[in-house]
Amino acid sequence: MEKRILDKFRMGYFILYRNQGGLFSKGIIAKQLKAGFSKANAVYTHIEVSGGENHSVNISPPISKMIEIDKAHKGRYIRVMRYRNKDYEDGKRYKVAYFSAVLCNKGYDVKGILSFVFKWFKQNNRLYFCSEGAAWALQMEYPNALKGMKPEECMPAHFTDPYEFEEVWEGEL
């Protein structure tokens, strides 16, 4: 990956991944569209918190882990977003990245993602799915971020809200 692109992946920034056509992704898109998100934003079905340069925390089955973005997601279309807050750039983003890293090596909340798509599934509150983990990490520093919603109610498209997030870069890895 080119150095100029890697420079966009600062610690604590959020990386949104466009749908690749999987069964769960289609369910997430439908849920986000039903929640009122535009099609342009609803197609982002996965999110990770950047650890800086080519690293991020990937919360996906079977366990969350630190990955190398350029290897794990090569060829995927992404948007890099940052939280709109002066303190965020002055250092708070490092704490968000730290809180996200705390979630590494935890199991993935399969029941949580199923409850996200099908309301009759019960969620495990000790485990996380991708947008829930990103929201939790952000709200550890900014409790009112994402309009104060509970992390388990958060969807990847919530990180596209132009009032709370600013796009840093968009394109294919």
Q: For each of these PLM feature ranges, what is it?
A:
Residues 1-8, 39-41:
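Short, surface-exposed secondary-structure edge patches
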Residues 9-13:
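Loop/turn positions that initiate beta-strands
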